[in-house]
Amino acid sequence: SVDAAKYMLAAGRILRGDFDSEKDLLVKSDPDSAGPIVFADFEDGTYGKWLSTGTAFGKGPVTLETKAEYQKDVRPHGKFFVNSHNVRLSGKTPSSGSADDQLGSLTSPRFRIERDFITFLVGGGAYKKETCVNLLVDGKVVLSATGRSNNTMTETGWDVRRWRGSEARIQVVDKRKGGWGNIGLDHIV
């Protein structure tokens, strides 16, 4: 079972944006728990079995070298990360506005929720339902997170105990054109 004090501490850290999955996620859901599961980190340089629609996410994850220079320090975990601020379309670096005008979604394959928490890095626009990361259960959005109108990805997390054992998908959404019309994601645990 989850220690109430540890849970409250982790919840406060999520709200402050300083949740650390390497440390905080090690709160086991039961004595037989094997610890965190890295669901996706994109370190093979592809989206794998994720379904990409539209033009926002390009053909694969970006690196610090291939993202727009003006996005500054996005703080990914590892080399590759998801970023819908698509400057890859023509081989040129378009203006910030045109890169933010690309729309699309990226949806994971189905998976079974096996732990009490899901954490990830997220950055980009702070527009609910428009630039967000969603947890889908039975095809419906049950939890959602946005960036903070900042390209620097911060760790956030969801308490998913309610859906433990359920099949789910993670969906990254970019439905917004213009300033902060982008979303970044990395290291889903």
Residues of each region from the PLM?
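Extracellular carbohydrate-recognition regions
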Residues: 1-65
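Extracellular/lumenal ectodomain signal focusing on beta-strand-rich modules
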Residues: 16, 41-44, 84, 110, ...
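Extracellular polysaccharide-targeting segments
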Residues: 32-33, 38-41, 176-189
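Extracellular beta-strand-rich recognition modules
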Residues: 42, 117-124, 168-174
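Short carbohydrate-recognition loop motifs
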Residues: 66-100
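Short beta-strands within extracellular/lumenal beta-sheet-rich domains
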Residues: 86-117, 127-130, 153-157
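Extended, low-complexity, turn-rich repeat/linker tracts enriched in Gly/Pro/Ser/Thr and Asp/Glu
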Residues: 114, 121-132, 177-180
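Extracellular carbohydrate recognition and processing domains
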Residues: 135-183
